[in-house]
């Protein structure tokens, strides 16, 4: 019998305005076959850590928690100190992944570096730097990581299909690294990279609910 190629895991990102809508969207995502759900906490008009803990315990090892900063596309107007306090509280939720922007991680690496379920993310919403530039960025982040379960996520905007090639070339460079690499491109030209990234080594891919 021939070995079947395993189906890639995919993560659905949800930016809900309130906790009621968030719960229903999470249920819809899992019913549609999602393996993971990313919760954009910055989109919620209000929430409590106890509520997020309840979700984390209900959906063990299936949630990615993130609170994007304003300059990284975040939707909340809270102060940076308040945002950092929330991120710190999320570290107590052991059954969920935490996605932290690279600049926040670099400024507070001692706080986050030992988190087992950590995703350090870097986004460029306008273009895709060279493969060498992205490699330097990844190496600098990786120096502060400490666990093989940790993930570095690189997301760039593809103005052409060649931009996707720049990202593809990252995977063989970091194949034997002490972390996992998750890299793909945004935009119409970058759509194909979401499909190909798990074949190159990404632990999972990101999709919207309408694409499931």
Where are the predicted features?
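Conserved small/polar residues in nucleotide/adenosyl-binding loops
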Residues: 210-212
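Alpha-helix-loop-beta-strand connector modules within alpha/beta enzyme cores
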Residues: 49-71, 171-177
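Glycine/small-residue-rich loop that forms an oxyanion/phosphate-binding "nest" at active or ligand-binding sites
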Residues: 65, 69-100, 107
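Active-site-adjacent beta->alpha loops and helix N-cap segments on the catalytic face
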Residues: 43-55, 102-113, 159-171
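Short, acidic/polar
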Residues: 17-29, 81-87, 129-142
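Acidic (Asp/Glu)-rich catalytic clusters
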Residues: 27-31, 48-60, 90-92, 108-115, ...
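Catalytic beta/alpha-barrel core
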Residues: 15, 36-44, 66, 95-106, ...
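Active-site mouth loops of central-metabolism enzymes
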Residues: 8-21, 70-79, 122-132
């Amino acid at each position: 019998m021939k070995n079947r190629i395993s189906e890639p895991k995919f993560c659905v990102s949800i930016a809900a305005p309130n906790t009621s809508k968030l719960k229903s969207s999470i249920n819809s995502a899992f019913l549609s076959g999602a393996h993971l759900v990313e919760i954009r906490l910055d989109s919620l008009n209000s929430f409590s850590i106890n509520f997020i803990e309840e979700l984390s315990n209900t959906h063990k090892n299936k949630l990615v928690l993130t609170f994007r900063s304003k300059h990284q596309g975040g939707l909340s107007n809270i102060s940076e100190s308040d945002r950092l306090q929330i991120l710190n509280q999320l570290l107590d939720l052991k059954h969920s992944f935490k996605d932290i922007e690279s600049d926040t991680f670099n400024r507070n690496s001692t706080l986050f570096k030992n988190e087992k379920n950590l995703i350090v993310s870097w986004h460029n919403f306008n273009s895709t730097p060279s493969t060498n530039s992205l490699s330097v960025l990844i190496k600098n982040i990786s120096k502060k990581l400490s666990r093989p379960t940790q993930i570095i996520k690189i997301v760039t905007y593809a103005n052409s299909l060649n931009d996707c090639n720049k990202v593809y070339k990252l995977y063989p460079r970091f194949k034997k690294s002490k972390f996992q690499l998750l890299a793909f491109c945004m935009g119409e030209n970058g759509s194909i990279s979401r499909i190909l990234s798990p074949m190159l080594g990404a632990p999972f891919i990101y999709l919207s609910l309408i694409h499931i």
